[in-house]
């Protein structure tokens, strides 16, 4: 062993050197102790026979570690891929140390840059039986959907190198490369290639059996418009549920539609209609408008099952068949402000000759006379009058009736009946012209020019607005007083519009419904804006009721799974595994009892459990068997997974085994 003190290099008389093991040939595989102690041996070049390279000693002592050493070493001066030795010849032994030539090695260039440089300087490919790896032959990463024609020049086309199909991470590994036969083996998949499903590489991975959460239909998204007058922590009941007034209105309309009249004296069948229910509020006959007493009924059609309104003209005798054919023109009128006419026919089921008009049925609708007028006698006796009508509501009526007359006159027809008792109020400030086309049949023989009838519609329109604004059903008896009251109550624009309508029969200038609509365009925009706000509100209300059947679907799946009689003796299905604690969960939700062993009927508990199950929360629940010998602690997420898996097993029985 070398001396611990500092030796004198120039002293040639001292023969101290690295210890030598005479007679041992493996001294070259023994690490010199000077290297271990001092880090180097000063006698390495003066005859020391021991090994001064620790890496060679480790390779000699651990040959298995040397064989597993990575081929690509960061200490190597340049990247040189390994090739299979030809004819079984052994490859050259690589040096593990850094070569002095490493200082002159070329700088590292990315693959794309190097491939571009190769395109500029063609190189000849060595002629060997086995193709060698080339940087230019490897394609760059190109997502699916990207046009590869723009990057063909990068992959060696035109550089003198024969391009071979390279590895594509988006192609299944079972697909062989190319048809040239140069490479016959299959390329192994690259475990480091990133292939998110959003790029479209889902086909690269096989299907897996892991449980996937379904689309979260139970997560309701608040759809506008939103109320900006409340703070962030404040909530209204309308923000969570459908407004009670709207719900009650729809329920009442549904009940009125399905209403029947037992022990009725009405005919059981009129043509293809049945289940007649009278809609008139008075039993007094009134023939002032049509010339015949008229009655209105609700009936159900045997053809489509829908409900319609039947208006019967009592005692009418049809003398001209062409008169009833005029109803065909009214079938083509499609307007939201006109009650649609579907059919007209004569019938003797009421023990007389009656004319029946079939129109749409709007449940719980009122007439404008019932809503705003009360004369103290006749049909409207004792009804509450709303008094003065706000001008904005009156303008809403004007725009809707103008819309109806626009559609009717454009079809070459005339309404002829614009009366408060024949205009339906089907919703909040929502009106529709009713009983249109009846006078075309009743007064078919005494036809007037269409232009005169349309001008008369304008006059009747003005008289209607004046009657409603003055709150005077007897307008014709004292028109001056009604006009003065109307002028004092409403703006000049509304007064001028009504005066223009009342002058519809004058020949001093052209008067059409189109000219009238142009004059009230500002009010049309206001009404249109209100309809848009109502549309937004209805969409918001509908979004809250979009998935209100999700708990029913969940209950249906649970009932499909639990206690199936065909699997009663199949322990794999009913008494073991996930089906068993689904059965216990059913008892936990619906079959609880109190301290007195009485059934607990708690709808809130049922809804809470089902909502948590539908959401798949991480909250855990304790399930105990009926004999109290088994206890499970599971989460709602696991329960939801079990429900979906069991239901899919029912759809595909082969999975159950």
Curated annotation (Swiss-Prot):
Free-text function comment from the UniProt entry: Regulatory subunit of the poly(A)-nuclease (PAN) deadenylation complex, one of two cytoplasmic mRNA deadenylases involved in mRNA turnover. PAN specifically shortens poly(A) tails of RNA and the activity is stimulated by poly(A)-binding protein PAB1. PAN deadenylation is followed by rapid degradation of the shortened mRNA tails by the CCR4-NOT complex. Deadenylated mRNAs are then degraded by two alternative mechanisms, namely exosome-mediated 3'-5' exonucleolytic degradation, or deadenylation-dependent mRNA decaping and subsequent 5'-3' exonucleolytic degradation by XRN1.
Domain comment (free text): The N-terminal zinc finger binds to poly(A) RNA. Contains a pseudokinase domain. The protein kinase domain is predicted to be catalytically inactive because some of the residues important for catalytic activity are substituted and it lacks the equivalent of the binding site for a peptide substrate. However, it has retained an ATP-binding site and ATP-binding is required for mRNA degradation, stimulating the activity of the PAN2 nuclease in vitro.
Protein name as annotated: PAN2-PAN3 deadenylation complex subunit PAN3
Biased composition annotated in UniProt, kind: Polar residues: 75-98, 115-132
Family: Belongs to the protein kinase superfamily. PAN3 family.
Species this protein is from: Coccidioides immitis (strain RS) (Valley fever fungus)
HAMAP family: PAN3
Gene: PAN3
SUPFAM superfamilies reported in the protein's UniProt record: Protein kinase-like (PK-like) (SSF56112)
InterPro entries for the chain: Kinase-like_dom_sf, PAN3, Pan3_PK, Prot_kinase_dom, Znf_CCCH
